[in-house]
From Swiss-Prot:
GO annotation, biological process: cell envelope organization
A GO cellular component annotation in the UniProt record: periplasmic space
Summary of subunit composition and partner proteins: Monomer.
Origin superkingdom: Bacteria
Any single Pfam family the record assigns to this protein: EipB_like
Phenotypic effect of disruption: Sensitive to the cell envelope stressors ampicillin, deoxycholate, and ethylenediaminetetraacetic acid (EDTA). Decreases virulence in a mouse model of infection.
UniProt effect for mutating residue 69 to S: Abolishes disulfide bond formation
Gene name linked to the record: eipB
Protein name: Cell envelope integrity protein EipB
SS bonds (residue pairs): 69-278
Signal peptide positions (record): 1-24
Keyword terms: Disulfide bond, Periplasm, Signal
Amino acid sequence: MRFVRIAAAASGATVFMWAGFAGAASAASAVRLVPHRAIYDLTLDRADEKSGISGLTGRMVYEFNGSACEGYTTNFRFVTRVDMDEQPQRVTDQQTTTFEDADGKDFRFVNKTFVDKELVKEVRGDAKLEDGKTVVKLSKPKENTLDLKGTQFPTRHMEELIGKAEAGQKFYQTTLFDASEDADRVVATTVVVGKQQAVPDDETKVMGKFSKDQVWPVTIAYFDDKEQQDGMPIYRINFKLYRNGITRDLTMDYGDFSMRGKLVKLDIYDTGKNKTGCSK
């Protein structure tokens, strides 16, 4: 899956993120991501006093579909109920739909954020990799065109990760455009991959035919010079990764608080009908 960060601050603001460009295509070519729908229960892991957060629960639903022939579609929903000190409970609902073409050159996105059922933000547009640049054309919240540095999109980012993990690479750095926040920046990522292993726990019961498969423990840190000038990541996520792209046992760390995501339901989609005539 791709990765999301969403922080509900006291002001009600939300921050959204979807978790070596030249080498990405070759590393990703042998990776096969399985279409699926995964549901995660969210709970508060820890909260520093300065965060103002006294409680957090929620649910994350992630749907991934498509193939290396037709491209990849994702539908994502991330709902959190956050209790703040001396403030009423706030419900934030992040809804995202994206399409990434099979070549990893085009990326379309629609991000909507609701706070207490009220639409407070919508970002809509598309991005293309052209002449070593990432050209972003926004239609909402207002029309705008941005020329950013060349990078990769979320599905290719995940394929690269799995390819490097299978090759035994434990540490690398790369970049990503994921249409986070205002869809106006490329973020840097630092990836650490642990030793592949079997980790039986409550979540493996949900994995069905993949329950005995081994996983890689992975940590990804995201950096953005526009927000952090001290070299510290703006967000960090830990998770267990299967070679087919499914993830579980998530810990999402925002600095002054973190939350856990436990996989509670997994549906694997039958794509046999969609692969007729597809040799990839």
